[in-house]
């Protein structure tokens, strides 16, 4: 079920779709959301790294409990991530936080996790690690410290999830 569809800037489209449980529901939700976004059926494939591909578009897809989110553009590289709210992020924070990132609250940790996933997808060809990325939540800037690149990101959140996205 379509929850949200919006044109963000230029030719960038963002869509959010409610889905059921399981991988088949995720696939069906992706296809249905793409039809809503592009007003026609398109072939969705994946490269050897698992990155989604739609001919003529830069695309990024994310799933979480009950949702699929897609951002796409003809001109801009894009990245997106959505995460269901959970305390689990506190247990895994050491995996994605740098030693100079001192976040402890669930909201901050979920945001940093989402942003790093978004940036990873944005620069997927570079195969960044979580340690290669530094997040400034207050200024909504993420940095790829390996190449001194900085990217602005957007945060959208509800009681159920946190969604982040970015484009170049």
Residue ranges and their predicted role:
Residues 1-168:
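Core catalytic alpha/beta fold that binds nucleotide/phospho-ligands
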């Amino acid at each position: 079920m379509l929850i949200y569809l919006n044109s963000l800037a230029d030719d960038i489209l963002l869509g959010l779709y409610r889905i059921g449980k399981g991988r088949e529901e995720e696939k069906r939700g992706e296809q249905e959301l793409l039809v809503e976004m592009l007003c026609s059926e398109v072939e969705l494939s994946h490269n050897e790294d698992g990155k989604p591909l739609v001919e003529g578009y830069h695309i990024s897809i994310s799933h979480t409990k009950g949702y699929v989110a897609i951002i796409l553009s003809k001109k801009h590289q894009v990245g997106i991530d959505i995460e269901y709210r959970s305390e689990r992020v506190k247990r895994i924070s050491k995996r994605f936080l740098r030693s100079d990132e001192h976040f402890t609250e669930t909201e901050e940790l979920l945001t940093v996790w989402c942003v790093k996933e978004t940036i990873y997808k944005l620069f997927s060809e570079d195969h960044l690690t979580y340690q290669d990325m530094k997040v400034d939540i207050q200024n909504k800037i993420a940095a790829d410290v390996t190449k001194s690149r900085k990217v602005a990101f957007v945060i959208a959140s509800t009681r159920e999830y946190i969604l982040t996205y970015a484009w170049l």
